[in-house]
């Protein structure tokens, strides 16, 4: 509990009128040797109605004098005890420190407030559990170079401690201490200074790192793979977009090559690429373009690389197409198409590779991007024997109606040059036919057309099956017409197996009385028909 006097002392800011020394002493508002003490605002005091100090500065002064009464008053006024301890250390008032020792807590928290190296060490000594390493580490953190210099010999004898202090100085970015350690002591590993410089994009620290590295190379016998280190730094700087770091590295022998610029491309630092692109061989630029496609670089980067090649990429077309497909990176295809001069159309080449190796989803996406017709893709899929693609793209383009699908696929078969591709489309048509409900009277005309289509393309087995299905519809007159028309097709196109199937059906129809001898003679009177059928059976049956 506070006494009434303490409550008054704590909360009175302005005295009502000047009081005498005796009254002030009784109130505890008199500082011996200085005069009256009065609080102003939240964090200042007025001394002898004349001098203004911060409460913490007044605490330091009171601590230096060992004036505990004033210290207690200033603490009531919300001063920081740490300043009283600093003052006590400056005045060697250890009796005062002893009184407040339990309230101090961690002495290391006082260190940032101290500017004097001697007081810094004395404060650190207040912590009984700390050693010389702890002191030196805090000296690094708080820029107390003179303390490190004082203990130089102790540091020099412990290589591990030297490395620890150096790395700590790097992380704290204390350049003066880093430089002193680098020149005065032996450092085994310098990597930390570069790592920190990259992490914080601190060019001055990076420059200092090379200063120490060159000093180490020139003064120590240690072997350093400088070319590899320089290359690593260039790649790291390029990946971070740090052009100034790269220029600094080049000063010391660094060389910008494909791996360096690839890092810049990967992390989308076009300005880095633009700065060095004209310093590398054309062959390297082509490799960078291929990598840019792989990395899905933005438009400006691709245009930069293409323009440096004058958009002449014919020698790497195959690799470009490969990367476009493998990495789903089609932007370069669009850019090459947009050229008014030297336009290069890679759409067909990319599409062909997509159809051969990629998924349905990738192909559909490409079709959408480049307005590719489904017919074009289906033909490619047929040539590559990708039945699944034919079915999926057909349904996506024309719906799931069997007649519509068959109609479009028949058109494709008519224009398909590859026989294996044509056979696959016909196979797909027949698959759709078998899995549909076409074997009804309403579909008679469509089945009629399908049978003629099979005859036209010499699809023997499929023709035979559709003829059987068509006959089952019980449309005798139309069936006879179909058979006779297909015989004409077989003769004209030299399809002996189709002709043999037709001949069998003609005999069957004749025996049933559905076709006359005159109709048979008329149908078989076609030029070269005798090479496909033998009419002796007809003469034999008549006699």
UniProtKB/Swiss-Prot annotation:
Signal peptide limits: none
Conditions for induction: Expressed in the early phase of the viral replicative cycle.
A Pfam family of this chain: DUF249
Keywords in alphabetical order: Early protein
Family listed: Belongs to the asfivirus MGF 505 family.
Function of the protein: Plays a role in virus cell tropism, and may be required for efficient virus replication in macrophages.
Protein name, per record: Protein MGF 505-10R
Organism: African swine fever virus (isolate Warthog/Namibia/Wart80/1980)
């Amino acid at each position: 509990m506070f006494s009434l006097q303490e409550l008054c002392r704590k909360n009175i800011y302005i005295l009502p009128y000047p009081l005498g020394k005796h009254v002030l002493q009784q109130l505890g508002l008199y500082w011996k040797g200085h005069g009256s003490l009065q609080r102003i605002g939240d964090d200042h005091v007025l001394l002898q109605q004349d001098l203004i100090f911060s409460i913490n500065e007044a605490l330091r002064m009171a601590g230096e004098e060992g004036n505990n009464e004033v210290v207690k008053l200033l603490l009531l006024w919300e001063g920081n005890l740490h300043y009283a301890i600093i003052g006590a250390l400056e005045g060697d008032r250890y009796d005062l420190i002893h009184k407040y020792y339990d309230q101090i807590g961690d002495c290391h928290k006082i260190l940032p407030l101290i500017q004097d190296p001697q007081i810094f060490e004395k404060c650190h000594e207040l912590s009984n559990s700390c050693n010389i390493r702890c002191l030196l580490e805090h000296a690094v953190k708080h820029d107390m170079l003179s303390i490190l210099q004082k203990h130089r010999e102790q540091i020099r004898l412990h290589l591990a401690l030297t490395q620890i202090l150096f790395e700590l100085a790097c992380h704290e970015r204390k350049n003066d201490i880093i430089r002193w350690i680098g020149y005065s002591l032996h450092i085994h590993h310098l990597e930390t200074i570069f790592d920190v410089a990259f992490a914080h994009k601190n060019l001055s620290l990076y420059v200092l790192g090379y200063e120490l590295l060159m000093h180490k190379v020139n003064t120590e016998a240690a072997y350093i793979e400088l070319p590899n280190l320089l290359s690593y730094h260039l790649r790291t700087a390029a990946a971070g977009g740090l052009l100034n770091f790269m220029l600094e590295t080049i000063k010391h022998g660094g060389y910008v090559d494909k791996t360096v610029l690839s890092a810049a491309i990967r992390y989308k630092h076009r300005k880095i690429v633009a700065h060095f692109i004209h310093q590398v061989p054309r062959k390297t630029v082509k490799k960078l373009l291929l990598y840019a496609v792989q990395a899905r670089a933005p438009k400006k980067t691709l245009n930069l690389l293409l323009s440096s090649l004058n958009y002449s990429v014919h020698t790497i077309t195959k690799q470009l197409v490969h990367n476009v497909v493998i990495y789903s990176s089609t932007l370069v295809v669009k850019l090459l198409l947009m050229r008014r001069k030297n336009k290069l159309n890679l759409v067909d080449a990319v599409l062909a590779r997509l159809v051969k190796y990629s998924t349905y989803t990738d192909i559909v996406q490409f079709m959408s991007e480049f307005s590719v017709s489904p017919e074009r893709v289906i033909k490619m899929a047929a040539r590559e024997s990708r039945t699944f693609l034919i079915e999926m793209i057909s349904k996506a383009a024309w719906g799931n109606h069997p007649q519509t699908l068959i109609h479009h696929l028949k058109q494709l078969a008519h224009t398909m040059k590859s026989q294996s591709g044509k056979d696959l489309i016909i196979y797909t048509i027949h698959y759709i036919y078998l899995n549909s409900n076409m074997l009804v009277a309403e579909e008679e005309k469509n089945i009629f057309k399908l049978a003629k289509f099979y005859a036209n393309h010499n699809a023997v087995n499929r023709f035979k099956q559709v003829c059987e299905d068509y006959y089952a519809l019980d449309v005798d007159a139309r069936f006879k017409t179909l058979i006779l028309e297909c015989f004409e097709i077989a003769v004209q196109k030299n399809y002996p197996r189709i002709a043999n199937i037709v001949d069998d059906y003609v005999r069957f129809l004749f025996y049933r009385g559905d076709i006359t001898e005159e109709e048979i003679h008329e149908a078989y009177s076609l030029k070269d028909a005798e090479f496909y059928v033998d009419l002796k059976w007809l003469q034999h049956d008549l006699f």
